[in-house]
Amino acid sequence: MTASTKDILATAIRSIPDYPKPGIIFRDITTLLGDAAAFRLAVDELVKPYEGLGVDKIAGMEARGFILGGAMAHQLSAGFVPIRKKGKLPYRTVSMAYALEYGTDEMEIHVDAVKPGEKVILCDDLIATGGTAVGAVKLLRQIGAEVVSACFVIDLPDLGGRKALEALGVEVRTLAEFSGH
């Protein structure tokens, strides 16, 4: 990806200081999603490394991962798997607890969402501490998925999420980095 492309994408992301609490800068991708050219560019850049790899499924994390993952799945002619908060899926599920800043939560997928050995890419808008993404990788592996890679529009490298995923042997790809929180 060129420096110009990185600049276009980073500029399309709104930064909101002191949200949701003082000292945090919230990186809001709704401005990128609302800009047709920037949204197209982001999806094109997200799928580029995976073209021709025979990816079976894109797994998107609730909620913005659904938007990006659905677009990626369409472009790669792959299926889409929603990873949801516990209690939101209607069929039999498997679940995984994951760490939050203060406590834990649970996510789940349908038991038949991925066949053993299928190649899956995990997708979300942002990687921070990696707690949710690590939980999602473990959940996908629990039902036999081969997690090929994880991709995100935004990386907050100071929070260590990329390193947490790489420690699990997962390749991580991102489009824009923002320092700090």
From Swiss-Prot:
What does the record note on quaternary structure?
Homodimer.
The Swiss-Prot or TrEMBL record describes its family as follows: Belongs to the purine/pyrimidine phosphoribosyltransferase family.
State the pathway, as annotated in the record. Purine metabolism; AMP biosynthesis via salvage pathway; AMP from adenine: step 1/1
Q: What's the protein called, per UniProt?
A: Adenine phosphoribosyltransferase
Q: GO molecular-function annotation terms?
A: adenine binding; adenine phosphoribosyltransferase activity; AMP binding
GO BP terms in the entry: adenine salvage; AMP salvage; purine ribonucleoside salvage
Just give the chief location class: cytoplasm
- Organism of origin: Neorhizobium galegae (Rhizobium galegae)
Pfam families, from UniProt? Pribosyltran
